[in-house]
Amino acid sequence: MSLIECKNINRYFGSGENRVHILKDISLSIEKGDFVAIIGQSGSGKSTLMNILGCLDTAGSGSYRIDGIETAKMQPDELAALRRERFGFIFQRYNLLSSLTARDNVALPAVYMGAGGKERSARADKLLQDLGLASKEGNKPSELSGGQQQRVSIARALMNGGEIIFADEPTGALDTASGKNVMEIIHKLHEAGHTVIMVTHDPGIAANANRVIEIRDGEIISDTSKNPEIPASNVGRIQEKASWSFYYDQFVEAFRMSVQAVLAHKMRSLLTMLGIIIGIASVVSVVALGNGSQKKILEDISSIGTNTISIFPGRGFGDRRSGRIKTLTIDDAKIIAKQSYVASATPMTSSGGTLTYRNTDLTASLYGVGEQYFDVRGLKLETGRLFDENDVKEDAQVVVIDQNVKDKLFADSDPLGKTILFRKRPLTVIGVMKKDENAFGNSDVLMLWSPYTTVMHQITGESHTNSITVKIKDNANTQVAEKGLTDLLKARHGTEDFFMNNSDSIRQIVESTTGTMKLLISSIALISLVVGGIGVMNIMLVSVTERTKEIGIRMAIGARRGNILQQFLIEAVLICVIGGLVGVGLSAAVSLVFNHFVTDFPMDISAMSVIGAVACSTGIGIAFGFMPANKAAKLNPIDALAQD
């Protein structure tokens, strides 16, 4: 069985009236160890034939077999495996990647074989040393002469073994001395057992081969052998490995090339990132503002008590009948306090009136409350003491004042122990409350607190309360507790002549409302992310066009479609992730400035918003980078190589 068998190979370019028949019923066979020169003038079809033999192109019709296996039935990745594992290409224009060193160019085919980094470097250095380039391992192609570049190309062809060497005009771009040196190397490869297929238009170069096939106008006109072929020897090559290092090395190579591509066009990359930066910064900042405002509001709610339910007479706030409803009593509060899910219950009654101290008269509000009220409402004592259970039981004529009362009446003296008059009733000051920065309502109101028994018995003369504040136990569900209290009071009153205000319900409403606002504003900010994503897609399409030749080179040395897809996808994701991180940093800087000048509520950047931003930018990179990457992966190797 011949190594290569072609039967009736035809190749057409163009269509319709412009269709050109390039190869016409080409049939030939090549044995292992042959050195074949395909000669012909420009346009004869010799390069097209070599491209088909090297699986860079496909025939329009006919059969092409390697070791008896029909290539026409192979998938793109199977053809890539042939190029990677058995073929080595020597191009007229060298086709080295300009961004890589000589060592890296030579080692590149082994990346797609899954060879480890040390193994790749050692083999590449050995090949370069054998070809007289030991001192040029770290040089880039632009730092090498034409002959040196071609020797690097030869070393690359041998990296994975190069059982079959395809040489396309290997001396065409070289001076006479360099061309002679390259042909000597090719002779040595043949003598070492490599099958060599060389394309040339020069009869002198073709004379080096032991078999010459001449093509004219797409047809073989002669096939002569002047020397018997050398018996083939086994050509050693790197074996493909299926291990974690296989995928790791390919990822590292793809990532490195992506970084180089981004850095090669710094300004373009920055402008591409700009849409992502603005979008991510907007989203993170909006979420931070939402978190800060929500946190501030919830702190304000906490200032009036957490896990609390307030019970009022009437059907709701603003009910004109509520003042005539007098069924909410101290007994209700006592019964409520005995429920298993209740931590405490304190009634509250209030009265407005004139507050007098010495010759000063002020309008103030006096609240009659229980001893637990201050703890339930989260009020803090600045000085003195709070009234206790005994004070409540004994109708003690004591009062706790707020900071406003202290400032108005006792600006220059200690209020503790002083007696003030409220509606002409004497009350002894026993404590002063701290100013409540988070309190709702008018902060200028003068407020006093006394035992509810004192207020009801000595000031208002009423037996009902204005409200009852209930503290629910931490392990109890406030919604269930609210229903239980409703059922209890309905049973006691015979009707539902009261309504409740659940602090947790307010919290839920605030969280829901701020969440909706954050979502709405974030949706608007996401538009800039979409615009940024379109910019990434556009620039990646440009990158694919600019690097089409590079894609062709990688495919020629064995890159799978998945390798090409991975490389360009990583590049898109890299741009977006960097943009996302810069956007997060920008948002953090904005929050620092904002928090310095605005003290009412902070911008609160959460870890989840940062993680979400990075995940979002990664998702955009994948979503908008896939189409350009997929376009690159589906390029035909020979079409890609033909691009300048």
Swiss-Prot record:
EC number: 7.6.2.-
UniProt subcellular location: Cell inner membrane
Database matches in PROSITE patterns: ABC_TRANSPORTER_1, ABC_TRANSPORTER_2, MACB
UniProt-listed InterPro entries: AAA+_ATPase, ABC3_permease_C, ABC_transporter-like_ATP-bd, ABC_transporter-like_CS, MacB-like_ATP-bd, MacB_PCD, Macrolide_Exporter_MacB, P-loop_NTPase
Residue span, ABC transporter domain: 4-242
Family: Belongs to the ABC transporter superfamily. Macrolide exporter (TC 3.A.1.122) family.
Quaternary structure (record): Homodimer.
Gene: macB
The protein's role, per its UniProt record: Non-canonical ABC transporter that contains transmembrane domains (TMD), which form a pore in the inner membrane, and an ATP-binding domain (NBD), which is responsible for energy generation. Confers resistance against macrolides.
Gene3D superfamilies cross-referenced by the UniProt entry: P-loop containing nucleotide triphosphate hydrolases (3.40.50.300)
Membrane topology reported for the UniProt record: Multi-pass membrane protein
Keywords, sorted A to Z: Antibiotic resistance, ATP-binding, Cell inner membrane, Cell membrane, Membrane, Nucleotide-binding, Translocase, Transmembrane, Transmembrane helix, Transport
Binding site for ATP: G40, Q41, S42, G43, S44, G45, K46, S47
Protein name: Macrolide export ATP-binding/permease protein MacB
GO terms, molecular function: ATP binding; ATP hydrolysis activity; transmembrane transporter activity
GO cellular component, one term: plasma membrane
Transmembrane segments: 270-290, 524-544, 574-594, 607-627
Principal location: membrane
Disulfide bonds: none
Superkingdom to which the source organism belongs: Bacteria
Protein's UniProt keywords contain Translocase: yes
PANTHER family hit by this protein: MACROLIDE EXPORT ATP-BINDING_PERMEASE PROTEIN MACB, MEMBRANE COMPONENT OF TRANSPORTER-RELATED
Organism of provenance: Neisseria meningitidis serogroup A / serotype 4A (strain DSM 15465 / Z2491)
Organism phylogeny: Bacteria, Pseudomonadati, Pseudomonadota, Betaproteobacteria, Neisseriales
Gene Ontology biological-process entries: response to antibiotic
